[in-house]
Amino acid sequence: MATEQQDSQLCLATILEDFLKQRNIQVSVGVDSSSLKKADETFGGRDLPVDPSDLRRYEAARWVRNTLGVVGGRDLPADPSEEDFRIALRSGILLCNVLNRVKPGAVPKVVEAPNDPLVNQDGAALSAFQYFENLRNFLVFVEEMGIPTFEVSDFEKGGKSARIVECVLALKSYREWKQSGGSGTWRYILNSKPTTFGIAKQYKRKDSEVPVDAVTNSPSSTPSSEQPLLDQSDSNTKNDGTASSIDAIVRAVFSDMKQEDIPVIVEDMLKSVMVEYERRLATQNELLLMSAGNRDKLGSGDLGRTISGNEETLSDASYGEENVTEIVNNNMEASQDSNVEELENQDYELYAISKEKTEKQQLIIERQQTHTEELKHDLKAVKAGLSLLQMKYQQEFTSLGKHLHGLTYAATGYQRVLEENRKLYNQVQDLKGSIRVYCRVRPFLPGQKSVLTTVDHLEDSTLSIATPSKYGKEGQKTFTFNKVFGPSASQEAVFADTQPLIRSVLDGYNVCIFAYGQTGSGKTFTMMGPNELTDETLGVNYRALSDLFHLSSVRKETFSYNISVQMLEIYNEQVRDLLATNEIRNSTQDGINVPEATLVPVSTTSDVIHLMNIGQKNRAVSATAMNDRSSRSHSCLTVHVQGKDLTSGVTLRGSMHLVDLAGSERIDKSEVTGDRLKEAQHINKSLSALGDVIASLSQKNNHIPYRNSKLTQLLQDALGGQAKTLMFIHISPELEDLGETLSTLKFAERVATVDLGAARVNKDTSEVKELKEQIASLKLALARKESGADQTQLQRPLTPDKLLRKKSLGVSSSFSKSANSTRQVQTKHKPSQIDDVNSIEGQSDSASSLDLQGLVGSPSWKTPPRDGKEEDMEFIIPGSEWVDKHEDEITRSSKPENRAHTQLEKRTSSLKREATRGVDKNKCNSSVDKGLEVRKIPYEEEANESDETATSDCSETNLMWQLNVQVNMPRPASNGSSTKLKKNQSKISRVAAETRSMIPSLIPTPTRTLSLGAAISSPGQTSSRHNNSTVVVKKRQNPK
């Protein structure tokens, strides 16, 4: 019987549990007391959550703590109540920090809480600024992100904290979407169910209550202990473990329910219990009917026991119903009492807390007002100070602005004056003909160990070198040049200063630019560039020709230019053509120094690069200990420019010589042997000869040793005053090269002191050409007309006067061989004027030219005497190419035969007749210096000085090559042998041929216009040509 009653109570508990599950009311039925005690210890006696909103709040709180860390989220509990959650987040600090973790920089400045011990940590009143500023920044940014927001009033008591929780969870969802890759569009969907939480069973109990054992679903389970029900007055024998389980279930269900919901739940619960009991009774009745066939077999005892069992079951059911009703009533009374007491306690606590908060807030407000007054006072003081500082700063800025404006104006004026001074200085240099000297300091090469530099100071035109004691007085040596380029100067900057000089080639001037310095100092880099050429590293040669092409294309409407290029080198005192091997010649009419050398017309920069690459391949280059690409020869790139004015027909001729000298080197440093040693000796010898020429030019000596080296002969016209000359001086900054650096800089100082004279334009106008053609035509006609007289004069016998003329020509030829004899004669006699008829003789390609092969063997002719007082006789000696330009002028005061007769009478009257002729011959030989007159044809300068071409004072070979010498001799008094005259002519031809030089001039031969009056004013002064030169021997008889 007891077992059946126990089963009935167990069924009642099962019915209640199924009912609660249908209503989504979770209650633990199969949890033992130890599990309840463990849960109680885990939550520390706090109220366990029942509502899903609590779970979402816990989830939001824990995410905030995990995001900010233990320190950042220390003010927010892990499982906060609604009040704790609201108080922790009401300042907005945690929310702004979390937002900055999700979106860095969303809230630039978070207003932190004041570090004041008087502020309550459980949510005391904050400052109005902090309370509003943080929340406002958070809500503005969150609303832009599309996250659900809340109101500031939700943080007040009674506010809707659920919106705050939803906002935090939406922010959590956004961060998870962003961490997963952010694919697609993020959208937050409200979810009322908690995601994860560790508590599946939920209940609430008081701290004063003892845990109640639960009843398991297993029918074999028995109650472990018996506990009295709360407020239960009577004791019942059936109050066992099952009743306690039902009591625990009911109390657990009704503990957190509202008072108005309890009757409804109780009514539904009772209905469920009655329905279940009715179902079970019907089942039992069916079982009884099905066993009706067996009733006969049953005994009366058994039937009675069955009836009594049913009655007991019904009684148990009625007892359970009464028990539930009683439990519900007791619970309702207990809950009402406890609620009233709890409400009273809460009211008292709230009143105390409110009072305490009010006092603290009042204190805080008072302190804030005090601080506000202090801040206002400080703000006024700061504003006054700022106004004063602003006024002072304004005054200072105005003063500085005026001063800066003045400095700017002065700097602008200084730059303008500096530019004008530079232009004027360049003009003065052009007028003086001084050699411009630019200095360039080579940078340290990559990989060099030495970092000590000898360059102490460097400015625009000044260079200071630090010198140790072994080079003289320890200190600095300062050098001044036209321009100084530092190690960081680019190729473009170097070319920019030489560009005006290079462009003057198109205007008809001759220009020479050469690089000087020791080996490895960067000469080839400046002139040509490195092996691998780029737009930034192109040398002066490439840039100069590119600029000439560009300028010629700009002027193509007014001028027509023809540009051609030659490349030469001097290797071991031998002149070679880098584009083709030919013999070097002297200057010719068109300015081309090697007539048979390769002269290539160019029109584009690519043509120039191609030719220069060919020349560089042919140039002698070798590696030494000081330089991997040491130039073993002097190279010269010559650019010939011939322009024609399309309007006036004026022809301009200019040439530019870009010379890359081989570097001077010390044998012990370069470590050269064999052929390299021989090359170094020739290089140093030629550079030494260049130094001697510069020294002579700076000292203005009469004799300049150009012929000591092929290099000086090559640069003769550039250094002789016919060209605008510029020298690049290159030095190395290494300390071990200090000796070579000082020597190079001193040489450059001597070069800067040389004055060559102003260069002139090489211009030929159409009028000058016409006059030259007329003069040549008239001279040709005159020569043909008087050719018969010349033939008669050559057939006359040799006389003592002709012997005297032969002796005189021998003396003249000696002058062209020795420069010392020339200087001695110049000190005794006056130099005669020179007329260069090269422009007339240069018309060899026209019909009116004097360069005719038919005049080679034509004899000289006889000219009539002037006024019956002077008899002239010309004798043409062909075969000489030039004679020395320094000849002596000797005049006679009487006729030779009369003077000879007078001298014979004075010396002796007792000489025998057979000795008279020998004495006369000796007298004639001793009177050569008095009886010989070398007269050079004077020229008549043109009216327009700009149309004549300048002649170099130092280019004596060019002038001598164009010179006609006329020697005046007395008319022969007796007949002589014509064979002696022919022998004398051949001797003079050999002497003249010995004086001819094979070294060219870099500058085109200047032309001077021979006036018509000067050419034909004297009928007896005619000449003929042979091999580009003519020696005219003339006898002049002065009146007594």
Swiss-Prot record:
InterPro entries from the UniProt entry: CH_dom (IPR001715), CH_dom_sf (IPR036872), Kinesin-like_fam (IPR027640), Kinesin_motor_CS (IPR019821), Kinesin_motor_dom (IPR001752), Kinesin_motor_dom_sf (IPR036961), P-loop_NTPase (IPR027417)
Listed Basic and acidic residues bias regions: 887-923
SUPFAM superfamilies according to UniProt: Calponin-homology domain, CH-domain (SSF47576), P-loop containing nucleoside triphosphate hydrolases (SSF52540)
GO annotation, biological process: microtubule-based movement; microtubule-based process
Chain coiled-coil ranges: 761-796
Chain intervals with Polar residues compositional bias: 215-242, 840-851, 1018-1031
Single Gene Ontology MF annotation: microtubule binding
Sequence segments annotated as region (Disordered): 208-242, 809-871, 887-926, 969-1040
CDD domains, per the entry: CH_AtKIN14-like, KISc_C_terminal
Regions of compositional bias (Low complexity) in chain numbering: 809-818
Annotated ranges, domain Kinesin motor: 434-754
Residues annotated for ATP binding in this entry: G517, Q518, T519, G520, S521, G522, K523, T524
SMART domains on file: CH (SM00033), KISc (SM00129)
Taxonomy, superkingdom: Eukaryota
Pfam families: CH (PF00307), Kinesin (PF00225)
Keyword set, alphabetical order: ATP-binding, Coiled coil, Microtubule, Motor protein, Nucleotide-binding
Domain Calponin-homology (CH) intervals: 54-176
UniProt-listed PANTHER family: KINESIN-LIKE PROTEIN KIN-14H, KINESIN-LIKE PROTEIN KLP-3
Similarity comment: family membership: Belongs to the TRAFAC class myosin-kinesin ATPase superfamily. Kinesin family. KIN-14 subfamily.
Name assigned to this protein: Kinesin-like protein KIN-14H
Gene name in the database record: KIN14H
